[in-house]
Amino acid sequence: MKFTNLTAKEFSDFTDRMTYSHFTQMEGNYELKVAEGTESHLVGIKNNDNEVIAACLLTAVPVMKIFKYFYSNRGPVIDYNNKELVHFFFNELSKYVKKYNCLYLRVDPYLPYQYLNHEGEITGNAGHDWIFDELESLGYKHEGFHKGFDPVLQIRYHSVLNLANKSANDVLKNMDGLRKRNTKKVKKNGVKVRFLSEEELPIFRSFMEDTSETKDFADREDSFYYNRFKHYKDRVLVPLAYINFDEYIEELNNERNVLNKDYNKALKDIEKRPENKKAHNKKENLEQQLDANQQKINEAKNLKQEHGNELPISAGFFIINPFEVVYYAGGTSNRYRHFAGSYAVQWKMINYAIEHGINRYNFYGISGDFSEDAEDAGVVKFKKGYDADVIEYVGDFIKPINKPMYNIYRTLKKLKK
């Protein structure tokens, strides 16, 4: 075995074959970092047949003017069941970064620690407890089992829907009542989904602005999304949910015709048997449905007059690799939330994953606080409703490479606080 630099193709070919390969460890992210001017390294291990058997993207930024801080975001991509390989990689990684005047190194492996449900109850251990002792023996210090959202540390909890051996109908059956109703509702409401082009990204950004204001969270800058759309290429999809009013109004009119037939039948039943309580109840129920239907028709006609035939209502930002579809961000028009556009977006992308043989649909980060007072309690409830599971990852590890200077660096940081 040898630790070596990799070409972009070697790196990409390997990471695309591996499970637990995060989108930050793919060629598109390497191209993005290079374009941003970030010092970037592709490194890995090759066996005696010159085959890549481990890989990671490393970035380096200046620290204290003369040193560098190295970071592997969700790396390395490696078979963690091969403990000998893991030991060799992390040992050689320290030697590699030392050659580049590294002050300290941070890694946060995309490695599950344990599995939970959305009540926070542990449902299983991932079998990777040994990694803590292994990395400690190599000089890496674990940063703790943090919860919540941190500007430096990667989120430790993901909400993940397993799609292995499931059809779209299986997924629908396993949803809770609200998710099931809203997923069916968007079909009736004439909500369609298409993918946005780069020129149309401002539509997505406007929805994110709406959502961040309503839910009071800090969104990323426009450049974050635009740059990833550009460099990740076909690994990014931005589905837009919209209403086609011609089709929607036609569906509502068809529904009205059916309701009118049923209503006339109920009237005839009452004529024949005025004492028929069931027919009277049916008549009242149909009158309510007809009234609701007419309100929808009126609303649709007014909105069509205001916006034209198509009205965008929701959009999401998804990052895809062969291992998983990641729901990174999403936003909805506050004014048209009642059309449930976000459910159309999710349903479209769940079907995309199934159709492309991708077994993992990642709703992405949650805080790890499962109480009703959690800052993301509503988000947790939404993701739970799709019958997703929670994966807790092992967390961050730091290794000082130049220990004396790292201690000085930490002291200076404390003094600045």
From Swiss-Prot:
Question: Would you tell me the protein name for this molecule?
Answer: Aminoacyltransferase FemA
GO biological process: what's one of them? cell wall organization
Q: What is the lineage of its organism?
A: Bacteria, Bacillati, Bacillota, Bacilli, Bacillales
> What gene is it encoded by?
femA
Q: Which GO terms describe its cellular component?
A: cytoplasm
EC class of the enzyme, as a word = transferase
What does the UniProt record say this protein does? Catalyzes the incorporation of amino acid(s) into the interchain peptide bridge of peptidoglycan, using aminoacyl-tRNA as amino acid donor.
Give the EC number(s) under which this enzyme is classified. 2.3.2.17
Kindly state which keywords UniProt assigns to this record, in alphabetical order.
Acyltransferase, Cell shape, Cell wall biogenesis/degradation, Cytoplasm, Peptidoglycan synthesis, Transferase
Which organism is the protein's source? Staphylococcus epidermidis (strain ATCC 35984 / DSM 28319 / BCRC 17069 / CCUG 31568 / BM 3577 / RP62A)
Where, per UniProt, does this protein localize? Cytoplasm
